[in-house]
Regions:
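Extended, charge-biased low-complexity segments
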Residues: 1-167, 189-196, 200-225
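GHKL/Bergerat-fold ATPase module
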Residues: 184-185
């Protein structure tokens, strides 16, 4: 995620299973993994006491994520381990505790309806092909005003941010729009220090943005079923 708000964590990210230096890339199998394939009971890496090696040391983590069998809370914990800025990590740890009591991925019911309708329509295949595209659309559909302004500039494979006019948007919408653009283009208009400041980004908005980060990292499988 070079150039995104998480650029400061790039070196650390390369040490996590499934991430390699960007110059080398990652070889991904075309095989579509299922939950049965990733059942930890059949893992050859379990200890003699049949204990799982855990997310951090799991050699099958990329496959488990692709199969959609890594829980939302587990993805958040992995995300926290990558963060160098302590104030930011502390805020996300708070969100993790809240999510265990009140799990929610979308901003509200209207957001869920908009996004899922696009997903189910079959007219936007890049939702499943491009993590950057999916993360940006996820954010743009979260705000009624932003969606009204942007929907005509989103096609099957691209988003034309330069044509979207956001004059009149509120402060939350402003942060959502620029974070969506950052995740799509790999820019850093919204800094990680700003995301760490609760006076600029409230907890509910931060949760939405973090969920978009998870989509940017893992794709649509990050969205709980």
């Amino acid at each position: 995620m070079r150039g995104t708000p998480l650029a400061l964590t790039e070196i650390e990210m390369q040490l996590i299973p499934g991430f390699s230096p960007q110059s080398t890339g990652i070889m991904r199998s075309r095989y579509k993994y299922t939950g049965t394939d990733c059942d930890c009971r059949f893992c050859t890496q379990t200890t003699e006491k049949k204990k799982c090696c855990g997310s951090t040391g799991c050699v099958c983590l990329p496959e488990r994520i692709m199969a959609g069998c890594v829980p939302y809370e587990e993805l958040l914990r992995l995300f926290i381990k990558e963060i160098q800025l302590r104030t930011f990590a502390t805020r996300i740890e708070k969100l993790l505790k809240e999510s265990e009591a009140n799990p929610t991925f979308f901003r509200n019911a209207e957001h869920c309806r908009r996004f899922q309708n696009l997903r189910k329509s079959g007219l936007f295949p890049f939702l499943n092909l491009s993590e950057a595209y999916a993360a940006a659309v996820f954010l743009l559909t979260s705000d009624a005003f932003l969606w009204k302004q942007s929907k005509d500039f989103i096609n099957q494979s691209s988003i034309h941010f330069k044509d979207i006019r956001i004059h009149g948007v509120n402060l939350d919408g402003y942060a959502i729009f620029h974070t969506a653009r950052d995740l799509y283009y790999g820019t850093d208009y919204i800094a990680i220090s700003e995301l760490s400041d609760p006076e600029l980004i409230n907890d509910k908005l931060l949760r939405l943005i973090i969920n978009a980060f998870l989509i940017r990292r893992h794709g649509m499988v990050a969205i709980p079923a």
